[in-house]
């Protein structure tokens, strides 16, 4: 229930420092060489800063106002800054919501800053700042406890005590399964807290009153939920203030614990009622701690009189007093002075009981005493002294105690931070294990003449792990002298602001217009140096340590600093030996290195040699090796040059010392090989990917969040950077040492001579090792680039083409607010999931019982991450991650650094380098890389995965599959030239595989066509071995060239063995698409003309014309139809007469097209295809007719646009009707003559128009002129202006005179039309018809009951026969004995007489009848006379 930062309960003592694999002999890791004895080997630790390069942490500020506090006191009390931390009870359990979660805080004056951290998830709203009005927070006066539902924070100031209630994380989320990458902190809803609630705060009473100069305090929760605060009394002793449970009303009470008696004061209105004793203040507590047992609490007080007192709160009595000076060897001076600086810590183990750690401070020395609390049956207590540990460091800032270890934090005489730890049970020699602290950035930046000061300073300021964002922001604010600036800046924005600020200061100081380059450079360096010094000052201030935070559940140790949090991680054995001070190597336990003492001594001597070399290497020498790695030069030659320089400047005989140490090594070659093998992370088997599918889903999902926060990622990667940096130096010094060995030859070796070849082999093994660590170090410092969303989406599309989007290396990119290094990006996006799944794939114990041990976990994770980053290992997830997250520049640089010396994953690297070149627009370089990678297909895991198809089916050789993927990628990106080049290269690989050949040649064809390389496209098409693909490509060629109007190329290609196919394709297209927007018929016509196939050309154009008439009802369509028929006619005229014919396309036929739906009848059944169609042959004459008809259609459409819709497909007979309706009588007559049709419709139509004009108004007259003008009228001289009616009658007259036929059919039909409409016949028409057929005219009169006109006609006709006006009736010879016979239409005359006689009552009719009878009488007499004369003449 209760866990205090001062005395954290410890878990069972399992592992306090992780066991390391010991050095083994030369050869593979694990081969030969006996490991060191099993057990927990004590190692040094390394400090890693947890200050990410994010924006300064955003604190939400709240003011805590307490009624009754005095203003004067706040200003009078000055407390030092302090810090502390709290770990959740289940923070070490694998499936707890509070796993890897903790709270830490910092106090300064009236301010308390609280932060909640998690190594698994990113917590939101996790930082608050509380300001206590008129109060100062007691150093260490913050205590955090947790219950099942709540987290309770107890806070003490110099005037008040406070209780803050927050929800427990287990009650904040719906499920215990945490799967989100971001979650709310317990501080999220703190804005709802009422800090003035009297139930949760109270003033410290003036009596007994807090000791004015004391900072000791402790607080805890009772089993009943009461909040208790223990403080030193002003008069000595302790008083305890109790707040009732937050949910139960109650009184506040104060209990004063005194040596002589126990007095309790119930506080009512805070009036003092207790009696002061004469107690001396020498028993005033310097440090307080509490340990809860069931329903009691033991309060331990380390007092000024150097005594430890133990109080029972329940019994309110002192249970034990122990004089600590009894355990101090030199105590005379201490007994005479009051104690200062003593500190007390508790540690509880369920198995071992309660441990007390006491630090006794004395001038220039200090001592730790470890005790175990022992109780007897009679409830008496005593201390069992476990250990005393001495230290020479003067100023102890803080220490932490577990049931096995002490961790201590000092400031030494040079104000440097020192952290050490020791196992107080087993360490007989009292040897403290060091923690290698993170050094501050270099005080001075050395800039060579060839370097730009600004670039070098910016590089130093913004290199990951150097300066925190907060230090840079504060320096910027000071440097700009209070200028208003927005300091909520991202890393890149801050870099711009810094550059701008320094450059502005530089410009502002310039007073002259002209500078020499050297003067400007010096001035520039001065200002940058000034800003750098300012940053260094703030970084140093923020790095000031305040406290240690130790979690016994996970054995995680943190260092709480003024500006940030740092973590301590264990060193590997090699790093530990190399980083140890030289003097510590003298006392290093050899058994921790190897069970073989000789091997262990050789290794220690070797390390001593390396340390001597490291101390002799100057900054310039170090740069030589760095630059040789960066410039891809030989590390061996660089080491040789450094050795030469060391020998040259060796004034302290260091080389002699090294040679002396080498003499002590029994087997240098073996020792060096051992060291190399220990540092080599090369493996032959790639790490498994993904979680064990046998594990339940909830377990797998829970594990996916383990160490998933930005903080954890940053720490892990800083750990990798630290290892890589240290190992790089070790390898560098090893190379130098090996060069020295080469110089010395066999002289240095005792016993038998060593082979020169063995030395060479070691040299060639060390160089790749050094380059590997350099590459990892470089990646740990190289910042990732923030990528726009559209670039990520485009990249994802490209990767989907390669079917790589399901790869573990290519997850959705989610950049954090701060820039990451590419190694951080890799860990967070890819590696963490692989490592965690690997760690928990085969657990030794059930996962539910698995506890998290920080040293073990961080060691394993960094080790596996190094394995994944190791350049010579088979997998290349790191490169895939960079490629998947668009880190192309970084990927390019990485491969460039890797390429010359690493021959693993060469093909994969070339492929990814090709992807980089594609992005940067260097297509030819990309193509070269892709071709180079092809040779490695089948040899590398990444390339094998690249070519693996989704269905697992292998359709061609691996290399061809690779080419196929790359071709698809180039196609999606839109690089047809590269596609052609690569496909051409791949054809050679295809060999006799005709399917692959067809695919590749089709690809070449397609992209040549896209580029407009028509000839090359045709050539590629002719080489496609698959006829089906070839036909598809041919169809595409036709369509594309038509769309581009590149018809000449299309027509002129030879089409060897493809002639019928191309004709079929064009015909099919012609019949399938719109006639007016595509010109496939004209293309086909040109195609046949180019090949002199005129009959087919004519057939094509005739079909085109037919369809135009049927489908295109526009004037343009009719024009094209005429031209088509004319072209078809010309084609046939070019052929010999016997071959000048074509087969007429079936009118209205639907041509079969691919994909066309079958035709169905009304019942839905498919109609049977027509069979045995009759073939119609069209000859030249038929075409001429069609051509004439097409011209006439166009004429009609031009004259009458409304006729366009019906004219196109109309027959000749229908066209005559349309022309007559439109008034185009000349055209109609021409059409009738061409097609040998009667003119009857023309005359009837013209007669009808005359009738309409006769009775129409002016509108009809005006309209008539339009169609009259379209007919050729013979010019007639007239004395008066003719009307449209007159002109129409004249046109009719002209036609009747011009177009005469047998039986005078046209006169008959005209007169019949007129009479049928009751129109009187014009005289000219009557006279005209009398001349040709008077008898028929008579019959027409009778048909329409025109009796009077009939009588007149008969009278005139009889007179004409008898010789009077015979020329008007076309009678050449009238009646005479010498003339030919004449006749009268007696039948018609009889009908007339009968009709007149039918109405005998009508006198007019009787008169008319008599008139005819008289005429006939006269006629008959003259006939009789003429007959007699004729007979007479014959007799003569």
UniProtKB/Swiss-Prot annotation:
Localization annotation: Nucleus, Nuclear pore complex
Pfam families with a match to the protein in the record: Beta-prop_Nup120_160, NUP160_helical, TPR_NUP160_120_M, TPR_Nup160_C
Keyword annotations from UniProtKB, A to Z: Disease variant, mRNA transport, Nuclear pore complex, Nucleus, Phosphoprotein, Protein transport, Translocation, Transport
This protein's GO CC annotations: cytosol; nuclear envelope; nuclear pore; nuclear pore outer ring
Keyword Transport: yes
GO molecular function: structural constituent of nuclear pore
Signal peptide: none
InterPro entries in UniProt: Nucleoporin_Nup160, NUP160_helical, TPR_NUP160_C, TPR_NUP160_M
Pathological condition linked to this protein in its record: Nephrotic syndrome 19: A form of nephrotic syndrome, a renal disease clinically characterized by severe proteinuria, resulting in complications such as hypoalbuminemia, hyperlipidemia and edema. Kidney biopsies show non-specific histologic changes such as focal segmental glomerulosclerosis and diffuse mesangial proliferation. Some affected individuals have an inherited steroid-resistant form that progresses to end-stage renal failure. NPHS19 is an autosomal recessive, steroid-resistant form with onset in the first or second decade of life, resulting in chronic kidney disease.
Protein name stated in the entry: Nuclear pore complex protein Nup160
Organism this protein belongs to: Homo sapiens (Human)
Gene: NUP160
